[in-house]
Amino acid sequence: MAELSLQHVDKIYDNNVQAVFDFNLEVKDKEFIVFVGPSGCGKSTTLRMIAGLEEISAGDFYIDGKRMNDVEPKDRDIAMVFQSYALYPHMSVYENMAFGLKLRKYSKEEIDKRVHEAARILEIEPYLDRKPKALSGGQRQRVALGRAIVRNAKVFLMDEPLSNLDAKLRVQMRSEIIQLHERIGATTIYVTHDQTEAMTMADRIVVMKGGYIQQIGTPKEIYNNPANLFVAGFLGGPATNFVKGTYTNGFFQVEDMKIEIPLMYREKLSSYQGKEIIMGIRPEDLHGEGIVADTYPSANFDFEIEVAELLGHEYILHGTLNGQKMCAKVNSRLEPEAHSTIKLTMDLSKIHFFDMETENRID
């Protein structure tokens, strides 16, 4: 398929507003890359520059070693799927899928072959004669995917393709897109603001904020080793807890509570003696007392529950630790109650520390 290279790419609009800053990324052949971040972070703008729908203000973009900055969108061998299905309402499913191929003067036989092959892969062959209005949202999205598949393009670009679907259908379509990628092997860049989509679908994730790349890595790398406060707080649900405290002589102190820091962190924190830092701990790494194995460093503390949300197999607890807001995921067997205090254990092998000024993880 294709390898992509974006080198020092910027996007500056005519009003001098810069949307993307020094974007650098190497995409391997057949890789599934997800751009994730909040609205306005530059992820869709970057995707549109790759597609040729936005001009690159500075830097270079290559496909298989060929510079693409000045190549017309139609000549980039890229297929794109948008948030909107963008189907022609007066055309049948077959006609919608065949439309782009007709414009490119493919033979009737080749068009028929490609449309039926894509329809078979997407399991929409029974609907080829129907109009879009007769289809469900999921079926319409499959038609939009099929229109891209028939192109046999080197690169697939997907701009929030599932955001118009309900929660149950999004889960189903996530799985279908992953399976589709495995079957056709196209190099794919997928844009979303949904961190669940990013974590479950990507080979690698590009986390963006304010036009800058915050971190690039596999879902596991980013989840376990977030580069900064933003990444730690953005990926994972509920979000990572952040607790401000002071590091002194091997202890992290929050008000009148002291947590003894494991030796593996102390060398990293040696230059922060007596300084205020931020500790990050994910809700799933707070457990009922006695749950953490003795082989792992841990700390016990009293947790004042304000709200207890039962999700069947677990509770999401919202409360405070020495006056600072925290959230914990605990097994439903604990049967915690709102406006009560329980003992929780913090798995200290899973904590992170962040610099107060730079907000970067302390390594």
Model regions: which residues?
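Helix-to-loop junction immediately C-terminal to a conserved catalytic motif
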Residues: 51
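Short coil-to-beta microelement around the adenine-binding A-loop and adjacent beta1/P-loop entry
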Residues: 16-18
